[in-house]
């Protein structure tokens, strides 16, 4: 579209009352037939008048008045002119006694006719002006005939019901981005553009589901043509059939039965109300064998079982208006701080916040608790209210536990064959190779450290129990340090760690009394040797013979002590290494 076309459409939008039709719409002065093509020379308003006339005038062509000719009679008016009057119910009684009320035409169910769309809109507007004026300001103006004609052509579903055309000629839904609540108890009333957008989304969903259903049917046909001779192929086909039957596509139902076509979405369903959760209220232009053209249904994400909630738009809007006039509504004020209906207010100044009074959400409330009683816990959405009313109308008593969404059943898993245990995947996996042998011993998948089995250690970390470590004297300070480290260890050690530590009792456990005696003897010997050294130092010695002198006893003992200390350090390091290896193995096992 070029700049000129954009300018023309802008001028068209500000100079005309069209909401949906374009500036060059070819449907301004033409009607649309059932196929979606235009019929020239016809006017939409004349077609509406004709349909209204056919809806009110009885189709009988025979007169019950004697002397009637071709179902009509001649009557004289006050000015003396004669008029031909066709037969209507109540005509004879109206002529005989004009003071009584005339009889009314009844609908197909034997009920009196419903109010017209215009009268219903008048009642809605009066309620909005009194209770919720801001929501009334949120409504669009009515559409034109050109809008409706182009809308019908874009849908491609044939002619719309007369009630729909009258309904949208009064108001074209709600403003986009207006109040956060919908007109119909929280359900947003879509305009013509919104209907086209929702219809396009559901058309894509329907197209994808049709492809999936076609693939399922094609696979079933192939399996029927290729009837397998082996039992394995038969089990596969049976499992595939169960999978198809367990999907939501094959479990679409309706209440009453056969009133709605068993599809998840259909091109003949025109949504005009939505709850922004994937559920819609729509006009059904392609009903089932037991349905009626133009009936109002609920379909969507939570409704695998579709419901017929009204036979036409007039009946649906009449129920909504009745709820408003009976007081079965509530304007939620929880989001407004200091509002007129806020329960947290304790002051007496009710003028504060009155401007924010009508900013909440419009929702349903059973005022006198006659319809649902005390069974309602929390708020009921209007879709849930319509659902329960429809179920009650069609004789379903268990209203609260009835679910309209399909829940697939759990399919039994086939047991693995014996040959499957030897498969390369199972053989390579450590969980299938090592863990299967110990399944009967313990249910815990971790290694049971308290069992009698021992974990194999590497050769470098094995300790030979036959080797005897020579007893060596250990100092008292070293014994205390070893005892302190042993006491600081956690109590939750495994038996492997305890066994490794207990293999060295001879090195750690030495009697304290023997150590004290040995230390006293060593100290006495050292004192004697020191005295002898002082005596020897007084005698002159040559510097040349100093290097050739043999080592004294004290020097030898000092060297032996150093060697012993080095050996003890090496042994302690070995025990520490063994403990670290045991802890690492325990961590790996856990």
UniProtKB/Swiss-Prot annotation:
GO terms for biological process: fungal-type cell wall beta-glucan biosynthetic process. It comes from the Eukaryota. Residues 71-85, 430-454 have a biased composition (Polar residues). SMART domains: SMI1_KNR4. Residues 217-226 have a biased composition (Low complexity). Signal peptide: none annotated. Disulfide bonds: none annotated. InterPro entries: Knr4/Smi1 (IPR009203), Knr4/Smi1-like_dom (IPR018958), Knr4/Smi1-like_sf (IPR037883), KNR4/SMI1_regulator (IPR051873). GO terms for cellular component: mating projection tip. Residues 59-97, 216-239, 407-590 are annotated as: Disordered. Residues 554-568 have a biased composition (Basic residues). Residues 470-481, 489-515 have a biased composition (Basic and acidic residues). Residues 516-528, 576-590 have a biased composition (Acidic residues). Belongs to the KNR4/SMI1 family. This is KNR4/SMI1 homolog 2. It comes from Debaryomyces hansenii (strain ATCC 36239 / CBS 767 / BCRC 21394 / JCM 1990 / NBRC 0083 / IGC 2968) (Yeast).
